[in-house]
């Protein structure tokens, strides 16, 4: 499972691949992928980092673990592959986007357009067994993705961290650099969205911060496929 990241993350994260926790994770993953159906596909595990380089990261949207249904996960938090029904949390994200900007809700949940603009769509756990949520929790991925957050925290150029729900907000302790911005609310899940996600205006808050920094704003509109 050792992966050669082709952008600046490669050099920054190279030491992680040599650490004991990652060696153990690697053994676990090789066994899991050989015995079970695991998502995403091996070649998609690090897509969040592949699509959004360290230098180009403007925003981080932190998720938990990948979708565990067929053909959903492809390495980006909240995003699903083309042709797959939009999951409920992402649908609520689209509803909030519609209310903020008037965009129509798209016919897909493919968020690569965001990733290509500097939105790092990072899950804290990068793999999952089919049909078993959180099945790869506590196996080592958290150490790896914490290091991603720590590296971004070390950056002078500000990063906007979007933390939805308690799981994501637990990572606030890693964001100690006052250069950075944190936007938080309850999770967009149908279980909690009406308790403070709807109306929280995360997308326009991001763009206000970027505009004040003199940075290009994110075009949040996802096109139909």
From Swiss-Prot:
* HAMAP family membership: UDG
**Major subcellular location class:** cytoplasm
GO terms for biological process, alphabetical = base-excision repair, AP site formation via deaminated base removal
Q: State its Enzyme Commission number(s).
A: 3.2.2.27
Subcellular location per the Swiss-Prot or TrEMBL entry: Cytoplasm
Transmembrane intervals: none
User: What does this chain do?
Assistant: Excises uracil residues from the DNA which can arise as a result of misincorporation of dUMP residues by DNA polymerase or due to deamination of cytosine.
Q: Which family does it belong to?
A: Belongs to the uracil-DNA glycosylase (UDG) superfamily. UNG family.
Recorded catalytic activity of this chain's protein: Hydrolyzes single-stranded DNA or mismatched double-stranded DNA and polynucleotides, releasing free uracil
In terms of InterPro entries, this protein maps to: UDG_fam1, Ura-DNA_Glyclase_AS, Uracil-DNA_glycosylase-like, Uracil-DNA_glycosylase-like_sf
Tell me if Translocase is a UniProt keyword of this record: no
Q: Name the Gene3D superfamilies for this protein.
A: Uracil-DNA glycosylase-like domain
Look up and give the organism this protein is from.
Bacillus thuringiensis subsp. konkukian (strain 97-27)
Record carries keyword DNA damage: yes
Keyword set, alphabetical order: Cytoplasm, DNA damage, DNA repair, Hydrolase
Official protein name in the record: Uracil-DNA glycosylase
Q: Where is the active site?
A: 65 (proton acceptor)
One Pfam family from the record: UDG
Picking any one GO molecular function of the record gives:
uracil DNA N-glycosylase activity
* GO CC list: cytoplasm
């Amino acid at each position: 499972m050792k992966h050669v990241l082709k952008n600046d993350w490669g050099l920054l994260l190279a030491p992680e691949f040599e650490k004991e926790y990652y060696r153990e994770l690697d053994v676990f993953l090789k066994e899991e992928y050989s015995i079970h159906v695991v998502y995403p596909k091996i070649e998609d595990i690090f897509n969040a980092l592949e699509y959004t380089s360290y230098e180009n990261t403007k925003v981080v949207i932190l998720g938990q673990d990948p979708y565990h249904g067929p053909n959903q996960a492809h390495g980006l938090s909240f995003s699903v592959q083309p042709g797959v029904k939009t999951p409920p949390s992402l649908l609520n994200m689209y509803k909030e986007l519609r209310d903020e900007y008037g965009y129509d809700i798209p016919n897909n949940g493919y968020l690569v357009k965001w990733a290509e603009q500097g939105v790092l769509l990072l899950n804290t756990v990068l793999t999952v067994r089919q049909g078993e949520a959180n099945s790869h929790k506590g196996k080592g991925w958290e150490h790896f993705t914490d290091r991603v957050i720590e590296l971004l925290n070390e950056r002078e150029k500000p990063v906007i961290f979007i933390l939805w729900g308690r799981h994501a907000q637990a990572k606030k302790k890693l964001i100690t650099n006052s250069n950075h911005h944190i936007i938080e609310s309850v999770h967009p899940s149908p279980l909690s969205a009406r308790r403070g996600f709807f109306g929280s205006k995360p997308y326009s808050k991001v763009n206000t911060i970027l505009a004040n920094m003199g940075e290009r704003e994110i075009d949040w509109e996802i096109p139909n496929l």
